Structures are given as structure tokens and as C-alpha cells.
Amino acid sequence: MRRFLCISGAVVMFAALAIAGSKSVGAATPATFTLTAGALSISAPVASVSLGSQVASTNAGTISGSLGVVTVTDQRGGTTTWTASVISTAFTPTAGPADPASNVSYAAGPITVTTTVVATAVAATDLTGVSTVVTGASTGISAASWNPTISVFVPANFAPGVYAATITHSVA
């Protein structure tokens, strides 16, 4: 029996030394992912917006109202600049003369920015041609939003009715 205990003890001691002296073996797997540059985009309300109303008059006047939130999103990355522009068609009634786009002005108002963009509003007083309304410079992914006020000069003696125009935003 003593011999069995001695042999058993030797086996246990050998096994303990083997475990203590062994090195663990592992397998490391590198993992990566890719972020690709996105686009420069602009969004604006697509539903019709009422700028307000007033009584037709022998005196000229101005109608002003909020257009709704406009947002430029720049997902190009890096150091980039952009220019947001706007153009308007004439405000045309169902009957009678149109109120020309030269009577339409645009004020961007306060600009809310995210991350690393600096955006500056530029007053536009005549929307017959493409007019710059906000410029931006960023480092990285960014966005800028504003809620512009559209003002329309209404000449004296314009006929009562609903006047409609299309205001188009673009960014480059």
C-alpha cells in the first residue's frame, strides 16, 4: 500500500508541476471596420407653407412668415466648406399680375450648429437669381439648421387671392 501511495503522490506532483509550468496558447484576431465619406445635402420643408395674410389695399405692404427648418448636413469628413443658396419663382395668383421674385427677401435667422462647423447667415433681398443665404466651414462631420423668414413686398392695388411661389434651396 505504501508503494501505491508513493507512486500516486509522484503522479500528483508531476501533474501539478506540468500544469504550473504550461503556457496558455491563444489566437488573436485583428478586427477592423471602415467609415466611408458621405455626401453634402440640404433638406427643407416640402409641404406648402403659409406666410400669412393681409387685407388687399391701396397701400403697399409686406407679408412675412417662417418657412420652416432648413438643414445642411455635411458627411464628407475632413476640412470642407459649403454654400447654401436659394431662389424663388414669382408669387402668382389664380388671376391677375404676379408679385415678382425681386420682391421676395430671405433672412436665415439664428443658426444652430452641431460639432465642428461655423455657419454664417447672409441676407438675401432679391430672389430672382440664385442667392447665397448661409455659408459654412467645418472639420469633420457636421450639420447646421436655421428657420428662415420669407418677406414678400406686396405692391399697392394687388387683387385679393392666394399667391403661390416655389422657393428652392441648394447646397454646394
Task: Cite the ranges covered by each PLM segment.
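Signature of Gram-negative chaperone-usher
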Residues: 6, 21-172
